């Protein structure tokens, strides 16, 4: 019986192409979840400054969740912030946060505001690799009104779009200028 001779140089391009195809296939499944698949509420802070509504930075404000498992402090209050991620609970239709002034001037007065989001949540299948994500439809937003004047969710839904989807309007002690003349 005669053995067939295999030309190893002829097999090299075939093996190389097969290996590259395998690497590319594995790369597709890992890159599938790089995009933002979860609805993560992103809040921007606003206030009236010199008669105009504009984005503001808030100094010395601690933000933490109520009833959240583990460490729920989202801002220690040790730096000025103009926006913040406020994750919603997926095991409940309500999420609450406390916004508390902690600077030396206001701390003795214990000035804090509780912000409550009431929503419905809808799980959406993304893929086998990524699992599911949630979309939140806002039903109501409540605040105790000490620091926060009002809150808006433009569109009423929080999806996985990478945008500021919550506007928190702080009391700044100024009233907005509603005049149409900018003279």
Q: What are the language-model segments listed below?
A:
Residues 1-28:
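Sec-dependent bacterial lipoprotein signal peptides
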Residues 8-13, 38, 139-143:
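Short N-terminal leader segment in a subset of presequences, especially plant chloroplast
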Residues 12-16, 23, 79-81, 151, ...:
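Generic detector of solvent-exposed, compositionally biased contiguous segments
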Residues 21-44:
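Bacterial Sec-dependent N-terminal signal peptides
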Residues 28-35, 87-183:
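Extracytoplasmic cysteine-anchoring/structural motifs
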Residues 37-39, 59, 82, 113:
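Residues that flank catalytic or metal-binding motifs in active/ligand-binding sites
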Residues 44-56:
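Structural motif
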Residues 57-108:
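Tryptophan-paired
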């Amino acid at each position: 019986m005669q053995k067939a001779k295999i030309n190893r140089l002829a097999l090299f391009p075939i093996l190389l192409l097969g290996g590259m195809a395998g690497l590319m296939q594995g790369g597709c499944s890992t890159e599938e979840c790089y995009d933002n698949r979860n609805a993560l509420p992103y809040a921007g802070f606003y206030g009236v400054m010199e008669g105009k509504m504009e984005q503001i930075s808030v100094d010395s404000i601690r933000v933490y969740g109520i009833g959240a498992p583990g460490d729920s402090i989202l801002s220690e209050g040790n730096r000025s912030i103009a926006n913040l991620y406020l994750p919603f609970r997926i095991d409940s239709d309500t999420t609450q946060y406390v916004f508390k002034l902690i600077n030396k001037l206001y701390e003795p007065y214990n000035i804090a505001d509780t912000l409550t989001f009431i929503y419905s949540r809808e799980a959406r299948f993304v893929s086998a690799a990524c699992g599911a994500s949630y979309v939140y439809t806002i039903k109501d937003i409540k605040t105790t009104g000490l620091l926060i004047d009002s809150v808006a969710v433009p569109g009423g839904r929080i999806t996985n779009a990478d945008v500021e989807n919550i506007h928190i309007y702080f009391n700044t002690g100024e009233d907005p200028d509603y005049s149409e003349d900018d003279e």
